[in-house]
Amino acid sequence: NNAGWTHRNRPMLEVSEEEFDKVYAINMKSIYLSAIHAVPALRQAGGGSIINIASTAGLRPRPGLTWYNGSKGAVIITSKSMAAELGPDNIRVNCINPVFNPDTGLAAEFAGGPVDETRRAKFLATIPLGRFSTALDVANAALYLASDEAAFVSGVCIEVDGARCV
């Protein structure tokens, strides 16, 4: 489940109820709807793997994205809860927590405006490996979690973050 949305980076009390509802409808309800439709098929198949995309924001929140941060924290704990409940059905559930990627369509919302050099430098200074995540970084983590090599990996979140959450 790679559905995701955020409100513009700004003080929490300036986010409208409509924006709040959209963040939770996309970030959390998408997991519910995916599970409702996928779990019966995975049970019938004898098991499988569900991967939810959360965010480092659910572990190490930044100011200005309070409601987004909370929604991604909910994705993390929901993924762990699903792993515990669906394990007896041989269904593994994991999540991936990518760090900010300035090349996504939501980058300006996360940054609170255009991602100029000043904003890029501010974000980059918090990532010890010295670069942003890429779609390929996230895809590689998903490939591992979906593979037979991860057959005994369930209920974990992989931070694809260049050590930001350390």
Predicted feature residues:
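Alpha-helical segment proximal to the catalytic Tyr-Lys
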Residues: 40, 84-88, 151
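Short C-terminal tail/terminal secondary-structure segment
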Residues: 6-9, 60, 142-143, 154-166
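Substrate-binding pocket helix/loop in short-chain dehydrogenase/reductase
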Residues: 10-12, 16-21, 111-112, 123
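Active-site loop immediately N-terminal to the catalytic Tyr-X3-Lys motif
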Residues: 13, 60-66, 88, 130, ...
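C-terminal helical subdomain
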Residues: 95, 117-149, 153, 160-162
